[in-house]
UniProtKB/Swiss-Prot annotation:
Xref: HAMAP family: Ribosomal_uS8_B
NCBIfam families referenced in this protein's UniProt entry, alphabetically: PRK00136.1
Name under which the protein is recorded: Small ribosomal subunit protein uS8
GO molecular function, one term: structural constituent of ribosome
Taxonomic superkingdom: Bacteria
Pfam families according to UniProt: Ribosomal_S8
Keywords per UniProt: Ribonucleoprotein, Ribosomal protein, RNA-binding, rRNA-binding
Protein family: Belongs to the universal ribosomal protein uS8 family.
Length: 133
C-alpha cells in the first residue's frame, strides 16, 4: 500500500494501537520510521522495537507499546505538525516544550532526526515533525 505521508501513518498506527490496548503494532520499515522508533524508545514512550526483514520482502518494525501499571498508555497523544502540503520549520529557540517538559517534539534537522531538546542543546532548528505527550 502506498502511503502519501509515512510519518502520519506511523503515528496513527501507534495511536490506534494504544487506544485498542494492543501489546504491539507493526509498521512498514523505513529509515525515518526506525529513527522515530529509536527516539521514542530512548525517551521512554515505548518499551522496545524490533526490525524484521523477510527474504525478498520489505521489512517491518514491530513497536512494543508501553503502559503504566493501571494499563493506561504512556503515550497520551500524538500530533503531526509539518505535513506534506504545509511544512513547518522552526529555529532552535522556537522548538516547543510543553507539559512541563514531559512532552516530546521531534525535529528533522540537517544533522538527522532528533528529539527537540537535543536539537535545542545543539543550537539547530529544522522541520518540526510531530509532538508526543
Amino acid at each position: 500500500m502506498v502511503v502519501s505521508d509515512p510519518v502520519a501513518d506511523f503515528l496513527t498506527r501507534i495511536r490506534n494501537g494504544t487506544k485498542a490496548q494492543h501489546r504491539y503494532v507493526d509498521v512498514n520499515w523505513s529509515k525515518m520510521k526506525q529513527t522515530l522508533a529509536e527516539i521514542l524508545k530512548n525517551q521512554g514512550f515505548i518499551e522496545n522495537y524490533l526490525v524484521k526483514v523477510d527474504e525478498g520482502q520489505r521489512g517491518t518494525i514491530r513497536i512494543f507499546l508501553k503502559y503504566t501499571n493501571g494499563r493506561r498508555p504512556v503515550i497520551q497523544g500524538l500530533k503531526r505538525i509539518s505535513k506534506p502540503g504545509l511544512r513547518k520549520y522552526v529555529g532552535h529557540q522556537d522548538i516547543p516544550r510543553f507539559y512541563g517538559n514531559m512532552g516530546l517534539s521531534i525535529v528533522s534537522t540537517s544533522q538527522g532526526v532528533m528529539a527537540g531538546n537535543e536539537a535545542t542543546q545543539r543550537g539547530i532548528g529544522g522541520e518540526l515533525l510531530c509532538l508526543i505527550w
